[in-house]
Design a protein with these regions (language model features):
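N-terminal Rossmann NAD(P)H-binding glycine-rich loop of SDR-like oxidoreductase domains
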Residues: 5-25
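C-terminal substrate-binding subdomain of Rossmann-fold SDR/epimerase-dehydratase oxidoreductases
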Residues: 21-24, 50, 201-327
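Rossmann-fold cofactor-recognition segment
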Residues: 43-55
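Conserved Rossmann-fold NAD(P)-dependent oxidoreductase catalytic core, especially the SDR/UDP-sugar
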Residues: 97-144
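NAD(P)-dependent short-chain dehydrogenase/reductase
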Residues: 123-132, 146, 156-234, 247-249, ...
Length: 327
């Protein structure tokens, strides 16, 4: 009989891709989310539209599942999470606590939790040429307001459910996941998708808006690398949080250049210093993931962004979002 897995957040970007990955592995997969996938039908055998802030809905979602992959969260890009600290923190704490308890009640064998690099202390991320963050850097804690603190609390809840109830929890700290079929507009999009959208809408020689001075640095992880890492972490015997990210550091300005090159356009950057830009620099130290999992990301930022841009441009053209004459 096939192993069964629940993927919460299956209507979202990472969850949607993870469902397909697990189905291809031979799992019977149930997706659960407050919405269905936006850009393509789910690959899973089941999909439940549920509000996981409600404990009763979490019990429905987790019933009969061998493994739980918990990705559901109220989140978005830097603009959204900096303007909605209270809602983000409250909603996500409810979802996390409810899903852990529902998994325990229904006897799930494993529980994967998607944490975030936003848990890392702000005092370690004040320079663009940042030292890559290793897992032990999380404490003394000084997480990002709202989203970062609630993700750190979620990690602690997982630790308590492992120690108190024997639920085999596994934790990944995501570093800026991107790729096709991710939200690219509406206010919840992340920087890679937002840049792809802006470039797709621009004519050769146009200006495009860049939030901040563009010299803030990040590492970005392609979705195929992410879902492979999720599975390896979930199936491992390692109970502590692990970074799941690329260690290829880039500036936001360079990200714009990479996408512009993929589009064959020469564009002028117009920097808006009034917009939120997050921490000054962040990169992932993948030493522990290599040691424990043998996992290394395989997709470069140039290849991943080109692939992402082509998907966003094609989708926008298909729905009529790209004006005539823009190519």
């Amino acid at each position: 009989m096939a192993q069964s897995a629940l993927v919460t957040g299956a209507g979202g970007f990472i969850g949607h891709h993870l469902v397909k990955y697990l189905v291809d592995k031979g799992y019977h997969v149930r997706g659960a989310d407050i919405k269905r996938p936006e850009y393509a039908p789910t690959s899973g055998q089941e999909f439940e539209v549920l509000d996981l802030r409600r404990f009763e809905d979490c019990l429905i979602a987790a019933r009969g599942m061998d493994e739980v992959y918990h990705l559901a969260a109220d989140m978005g890009g830097i603009g959204y999470i900096t303007e909605n600290h209270a809602d983000v923190a409250r909603n996500n704490v409810l979802i996390e606590a409810n899903m852990l308890e529902a998994a325990r009640i229904h006897g799930a064998k494993r529980f994967f939790y998607s944490s975030s690099a936003c848990i890392y202390p702000l005092y370690l991320q004040e320079q663009p040429e940042v030292t890559p963050l290793k897992e032990s850097d999380a404490y003394p804690a000084d997480a990002e307001p709202g989203y970062g603190w609630e993700k750190l609390y979620g990690e602690l809840l997982c630790r308590y459910y492992l120690s108190d109830h024997g639920l085999e929890t596994r934790v990944a700290r995501f570093h800026n996941i991107y790729g096709p079929e991710g939200t690219y507009d509406g206010g919840r999009e992340k920087a890679p998708a937002a840049i792809c959208r802006k470039v797709a809408l621009a004519r050769d020689g146009d200006e495009i808006e860049v939030w901040g001075d563009g010299e803030q640095t990040r590492s970005f992880t392609f979705i195929s690398d992410c879902v492979e890492g999720i599975y390896r972490i979930a199936q491992s015997d390692y109970p502590e949080p692990l970074n799941l990210g690329s260690d290829e550091l880039t500036t936001i300005n360079n990200l714009v250049d990479v996408v512009s090159a993929a589009a064959g356009k020469s564009l002028i950057k117009r920097h808006d210093l009034s917009k939120p830009q997050g921490v000054r620099g962040r990169n992932s130290d993948n030493t522990k993931a290599r040691e424990v999992l043998g996992w290394v990301p395989g997709v470069s930022i140039a290849d991943g962004m080109a692939h992402t841009y082509r998907w966003i441009e094609a989708y926008m053209q298909r729905v009529g979002a790209v004006p005539a004459g823009v190519a």
